[in-house]
């Protein structure tokens, strides 16, 4: 028994440090959007809705293990070398979707850093009909490539939330 206690006393601080490290190298983008939760859920859960994030082509296979395939340029087709694929890790309808990059576009500059990352998008309905959107990006390392990729996605996620807000708020005003 004393041996197990000694092992746990050694292992637990290492596990806690690992958790602390992952929270240090992760980031969150948040926004309250003037639209009901159902409108925002459609953005991330349907092929047509996903185009609101700024892509030209999209295909969403909403299931655990399904892919969200997207292409920013109209000069190709889904599945070509410039398609980005995100794997759906988990989802709770109208509340949460967790994804990780499955395949990057051929010209994606961060060749290794993406392999350990994932994102959890959480939607929270507010009493006044608006929705709080929270995108937690996790698994980023401290190496130079990971730091650069983090900066890229911090800005990119803000721009995505801007586009989504403009899209759903425009629909609401009709």
Which role does the model predict for each range below?
Residues 40-41, 50, 68-70, 88, ...:
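Hydrophobic pocket/interface hotspot
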Residues 48-83, 91:
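Short beta-edge strand/loop motif at the mouth of beta-sheet-based domains
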Residues 8-17:
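Hydrophobic h-region of N-terminal signal peptides that target proteins for export
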Residues 29-31, 57, 83-90, 116-125:
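Hydrophobic/aromatic beta-strand elements that line small-molecule binding cavities or substrate pockets
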Residues 34-38, 62, 89-97, 122-132, ...:
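A short, structured loop/turn motif at beta-sheet edges
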Residues 1-4:
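Positively charged n-region of N-terminal signal peptides that target proteins for export
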Residues 108-155:
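Beta-strand/loop substructures that line and gate deep hydrophobic ligand-binding cavities in soluble
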Residues 16-59, 63:
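Hydrophobic ligand-binding cavity/cleft-lining segments
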């Amino acid at each position: 028994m004393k041996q197990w206690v000694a092992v746990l006393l050694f292992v637990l601080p290492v596990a806690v440090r690992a958790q602390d490290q992952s929270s240090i190298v992760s980031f969150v983008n948040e926004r309250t959007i003037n639209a009901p939760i159902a409108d925002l859920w459609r953005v991330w859960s349907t092929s047509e809705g996903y185009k609101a994030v700024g892509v030209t082509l999209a295909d969403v296979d909403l299931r655990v293990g399904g892919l969200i395939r997207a292409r920013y340029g109209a000069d190709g087709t889904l599945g070509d070398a410039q398609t980005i694929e995100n794997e759906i890790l988990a989802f709770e309808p109208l509340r949460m979707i967790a994804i990780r990059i499955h395949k990057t576009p051929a010209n994606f500059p961060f060749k290794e850093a993406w392999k350990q990352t994932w994102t959890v998008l959480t939607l929270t309905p507010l009493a006044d009909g608006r929705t709080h959107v929270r995108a937690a990006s996790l698994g980023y390392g401290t190496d130079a490539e990971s730091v650069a990729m983090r900066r890229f996605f911090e800005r990119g996620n803000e721009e995505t939330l801007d586009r989504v807000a403009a899209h759903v708020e425009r629909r609401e005003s009709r």
